[in-house]
Structures are given as structure tokens and as C-alpha cells.
Amino acid sequence: MKRFWKVCGLLLGAAALAVLLYHVTPVRILTEHEREQVASIEVACWGVEERSTITDPEEIDRILAPFLENRFRRGKPLGGDLAMQILLYNERGKCLAVLQETAAGGTLQLKRGIRFYHPVREDPAFEELYRSFRERMEAGS
């Protein structure tokens, strides 16, 4: 009977460790295959009525580069207000994914579908990305 409880304890410990590793291990939000399908990006910033559509492949690569790296953790750190949406479209105009960036008490949070992600560490690249899009859309271009 002692052996049974030892095995149960080991299985429970392994399950707890698996859940912990699932949330701590850095992941990417987009795969290379998904990136290859993206033909255009539409960006919308909260509080700005204009939407920006980008079709230049080099600019799309620059914008999506951070999302292709293992620099995010799963989970929702805090609540927050929607700051920006990045909609990814294929050549036929079908929406492939919606990435929502939320400013959560100074912490960046991203949502794709029903999954939440946040950067492994502070990343000024996302703040700069948001700022540049907001300035571009407020200028009307």
C-alpha cells in the first residue's frame, strides 16, 4: 500500500511540474507557416478612428518579427484597456489571426484568440510599435 501512495505522490508532483513549465516556458505567438500566409496587416489603435493597412512584405516582416520569437509566456498577468489590434489577412482577404495588445498597468499583455500572453521581460519594442502606429494614424496616413 505504501508503494501505491508513493506512485500517486510522484504522479501528482509530475503533473504540478508540467503545469508550471507550461506557463513559464517561453513560446512564440506566430509560427513561420502562419507568417508566410500573411499578405496584409490592418492595425487599429484604441481611440483613433483611422485604421492603417500595410501590404509591404518588408514592413510586415519587421512588425511580425517579435511575434515569431520565443519571448512570450502564457497567462494573463493583469487586466487592462485595449490599446491596439493587429489583424492578419491572407491573399484572399480572410482574417488569419487577431493580435490584441493591452496596456495592463504598465505591463504589456497580448491576446490571440482565447489565449493570453505576456513578454518574458520588459520590451520597449512593443511600446515603440504602438507609438509609431498611433502617430501614423493620427496624422492620417
Residue map of PLM features:
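Function-determining sites in protein domains
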Residues: 2-141
